[in-house]
Structure formats: C-alpha cells, structure tokens
C-alpha cells in the first residue's frame, strides 16, 4: 500500500499537483506509522465517528484541498463533498497559479462542479497565519463552520479555531 501511495504522489508531482514538500510530508507521516504500527486504535475510531457527526451537523462545511489530496484521492474527496454538501476550496501552503489550476482540473475531472480558492476577488485573509494558507475564499473557509484540513499544520488549526470554526484533520497515511 505504501508503495502505491508513493507512486501516486510522484505521479501527482510530475503532473504539477504536489509540491516537493508534500512528498516529504507524506514520508514523515509514514515514518510515524511504521513506528506506531499503522493501526487505527479505539481513540482514533471514536474521533472518526465524532468527525463524521460534525460534518453531518455542519451548516457550512468546507473541505480544504491540497496537492496531496488531489493526487491521492480526488474521486473520494469529491464524493465526500457531495454527500455532506461541503464546498471544496484549494488552499495551499506552497502556492502558485499553475499548481492551483492543475488541482482544480483534477477535481473537475473527478466530478467536482464548483471549486473555490482561485478567484482573487473572493480572497480574504485569515488572521494568525503567516503562510499562503492565510488567503481563503470569502464564500468558503472564511465563512465555514466546519473545515476539513488534511495534512494539517498547527498554526492554521489555531487560527481557524480562534475564528470559531470546528477543525477536522487527518493523516493521509
């Protein structure tokens, strides 16, 4: 399974979806999985159920999409967004327009209709973040009550929490 994930990420890198740093983040996560035994424990199972409940109860859920998500599971993330009526928003730590367009193209190819995060006129700044992830869409993460943020870094989680949002994060390993 690990080799398949690695191949999908390398393919995603070659297609312009994944940043070099995204390859490293995946490798770092895999190292922890190997050390911890790659099992979903009882606490994690409870967290998954709680996250699912939060998503079903959300009034304005948004799924933040990065290159790793677009490379590894675009079909599944689009399906999830439709099932829970969540908006999809491209929000990147290492951002450039070419990469955003490649991610949007991949999501659309997998059934997404509307994808936020590429219209500069809709951009707002989320206070408390120094990286490019501070730029969010006024109709997406900025107004969301629940935000799904795969491969999360702590500063954005803290900023989203301070903005009154419920944050759901998970590791793609």
Residue ranges and their predicted role:
Residues 61-62, 87-88, 114, 167-168:
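Hydrophobic beta-strand scaffold residues
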